[in-house]
């Protein structure tokens, strides 16, 4: 293709309405009983070089039919095959290796061949009546980050469909999640990824799944039959429907920033080098840390992301999107996605990691990094300021912070408490990573202390706080301290403004045996330890009460920066490792008129000045009771060691 054609194609892609352009570009297989039409957008393919192959199996065997595709006038290639092809498989080949295309919607085992299915056949009974759980504000979300296999694979889970989508449809699983109180599950990758051999599921295999292969097909290893293209689709929908009936939203982990590899990717085998960024010296850029980075700023990649997000919403009823390494993507694309989603349903929440894993071959000021979040209207980002203020830096598992009783992180925590907005009582010169506020509203901050990346909370606490692993200290005392600190950590998360987020299993003091990066660790490391519910019942009870406390009180869920500045005031304090604030003048907002929250990270009880008055104690020394644990009066209170104190006035 000459330069003039490239320019015209780029201009056309920019000018044409996104929906029309995407539909023309990415609708690669159109099935009917009478015929199936195949269309591939392959602008650089040479004349008479695009081959369509049809197979009877999803893997193995020779093609029973081979056709040369005809070039259309707009750099697309077309072939039509008469007859009912349902149940057959196909590949495209432009001379770079066979591929199911960039936008396959059904595939065979291991995702190497596209599958010809009638998607209506994959809808479970009642799917047309499936309803997205209501959501007034992102601040009302309680996000639970979950790996499908982790949740149910343990022999102690008591679930039938271990490691499968269907485990999340079983009554025991649903009741557990409802009892905990979460209302949104962020699933780690559930698209078809390359790092699990679906033909060897008799052999234990594990991977988080951040290895994209087919972006628009559910992963087959979580289905009861990965050889059946329709099964993975139907069972995924059954899972979504069961969660929706339980009032739980489903959030999709969108890993558009890289592919598993380059040469074997569907992008590269369809339009070589187009979908990836390169450095000035012609090498593939690696802002993802995975060997490549995609070029979201290019028209076709942008359209691909838009159409993919829309497809997961339309076909699978997805309720939110978490963008992996969002900082690799450009601001314009992320904003286009937000605007498109707003037209579908503005309650669909979008957030992501406001960083990359390396240097990107694109100007930083144009990337969706955390520092540019204020340009991303209605898109949230993870607060590493808050995370590291509590537990210590990402770069050193053994370095603690406030939870270890170490000082100097108070302002960073305060910045997290207000939801990353500008607040007159937060000294930005003392905040961890940001010297300017990066959100306009608290709903643009994900508040958290741990996630799937690096150590889980229990392991991190043990690695950074010596007394938790000191064998000279009786185990009962060590366990009691671990529980105190763990509860304190999550109290900070759930009583802060923003969108609270927890790693699944932390409510039962889940650990990963100290493994820092368990992306491919065996089940013995990653699986839930369900027996912990009997071992540490007070942990689950506290998490449940904490979640309910937040749900019951809108004061912890203020939706705008102005409301936070109006109602949240920090208490004066000259002591270290002690942070307190009041939510005041809440008439018309909350049943509690004034709320006092104090976090004591010290190993000794501490006293703090509060506005003089009579208060009911709702949380004290690791116990929550909204009806009241007692009463205090005056202008000074004592806070137990390594715990939170919550008081209120009606």
Tell me the role of every PLM-derived stretch.
Residues 40, 92, 146, 187, ...:
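Conserved, mostly hydrophobic/aromatic
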Residues 147-171, 175-316, 326-345, 349, ...:
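Substrate-binding/active-site clefts of carbohydrate-active enzymes
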Residues 23-37, 68-145, 150-163:
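The feature marks proteins involved in alpha-glucan
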Residues 114-117, 121, 338-339, 347-509, ...:
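Conserved alpha/beta catalytic core and glycan-binding cleft of carbohydrate-active enzymes
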Residues 34-44, 569-611:
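Carbohydrate-binding surface patches
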Residues 534-560:
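Catalytic cores of secreted or luminal carbohydrate-active enzymes
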Residues 42, 86-90, 629-650:
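C-terminal beta-strand-rich structural cap/linker in extracellular carbohydrate-active enzymes
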Residues 1-24:
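Bacterial Sec-dependent N-terminal signal peptides
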């Amino acid at each position: 293709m000459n330069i003039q054609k490239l320019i015209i194609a780029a201009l056309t892609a920019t000018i044409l309405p996104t929906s029309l352009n995407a539909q023309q570009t990415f609708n690669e297989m159109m099935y009917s009983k009478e015929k199936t039409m195949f269309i591939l957008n392959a602008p650089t393919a040479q004349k008479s070089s695009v081959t369509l192959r049809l197979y009877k199996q999803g893997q193995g065997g020779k093609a029973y039919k081979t056709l040369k595709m005809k070039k259309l006038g707009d750099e697309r290639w077309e072939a039509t095959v008469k007859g009912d092809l349902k149940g057959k498989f196909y590949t495209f080949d432009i001379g770079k290796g066979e591929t199911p295309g960039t936008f396959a919607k059904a595939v065979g085992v291991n995702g190497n061949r596209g599958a010809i299915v009638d998607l209506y056949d994959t809808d479970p009974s009642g799917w047309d009546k499936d309803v997205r759980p209501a959501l007034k504000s992102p601040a009302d979300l309680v996000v639970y980050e979950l790996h499908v296999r982790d949740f149910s694979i343990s022999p102690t889970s008591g679930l039938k469909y271990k490691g499968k989508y269907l485990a999340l449809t079983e009554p025991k699983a649903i009741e557990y999640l409802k009892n905990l109180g979460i209302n949104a599950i962020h699933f780690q990758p559930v698209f078809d990824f390359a790092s699990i051999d679906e033909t060897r599921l008799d052999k234990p295999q594990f991977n988080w799944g951040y290895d994209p292969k087919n972006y628009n097909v559910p992963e087959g290893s979580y289905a009861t039959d990965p050889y059946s293209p329709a099964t993975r689709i139907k069972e995924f929908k059954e899972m979504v429907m069961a969660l929706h009936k339980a009032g739980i939203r489903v959030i999709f982990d969108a890993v558009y920033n890289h592919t598993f590899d380059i040469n074997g990717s569907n992008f590269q085998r369809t339009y070589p080098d187009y979908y990836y960024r390169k450095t000035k010296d012609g090498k593939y850029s690696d802002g993802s840390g995975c060997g490549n980075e995609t070029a979201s700023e290019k028209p076709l990649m942008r359209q691909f992301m838009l159409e993919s997000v829309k497809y997961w919403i339309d076909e699978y009823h997805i309720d939110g999107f978490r963008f992996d390494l969002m900082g690799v993507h450009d601001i314009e694309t992320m904003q286009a996605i937000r605007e498109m989603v707003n037209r579908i349903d503005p309650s669909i929440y979008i957030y992501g990691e406001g960083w990359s894993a390396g240097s990107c071959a694109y100007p930083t000021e144009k990337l969706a990094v955390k520092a540019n979040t204020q340009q991303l209207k209605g898109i949230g980002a993870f607060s590493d300021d808050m995370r590291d203020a509590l537990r210590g830096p990402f770069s050193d598992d053994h370095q603690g912070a406030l939870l270890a009783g170490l000082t100097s992180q108070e302002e960073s925590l305060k910045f997290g408490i207000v939801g990353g907005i500008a607040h007159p009582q937060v000294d930005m010169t003392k905040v961890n990573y940001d010297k300017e506020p990066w959100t306009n509203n608290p709903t643009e901050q994900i508040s958290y202390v741990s996630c799937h990346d690096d150590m889980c909370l229990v392991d991190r606490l043990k690695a950074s706080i010596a007394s938790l692993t000191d064998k000279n200290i009786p185990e009962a005392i060590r366990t009691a301290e671990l529980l105190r600190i763990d509860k304190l950590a999550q109290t900070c998360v759930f009583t802060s403004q923003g969108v609270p987020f927890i790693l699944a299993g932390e409510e039962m003091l889940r650990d990963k045996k100290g493994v820092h990066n368990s992306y491919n660790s065996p089940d013995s490391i990653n699986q839930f330890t369900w027996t912990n519910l009997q071992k540490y019942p007070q942990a689950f009870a506290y998490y449940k009460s904490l979640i309910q406390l937040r749900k019951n009180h809108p004061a912890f869920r203020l939706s705008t920066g102005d409301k936070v500045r109006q109602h949240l005031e920090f208490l004066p304090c000259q002591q270290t490792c002690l942070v307190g604030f009041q939510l005041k003048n809440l008439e018309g907002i909350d049943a509690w008129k004034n709320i006092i929250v104090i976090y004591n990270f010290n190993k000794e009880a501490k006293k703090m000045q509060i506005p003089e008055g009579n208060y009911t104690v709702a949380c004290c020394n690791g116990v929550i009771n909204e009806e009241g644990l007692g009463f205090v009066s005056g202008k000074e209170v004592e806070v137990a060691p390594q715990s939170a104190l919550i008081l209120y006035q009606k």
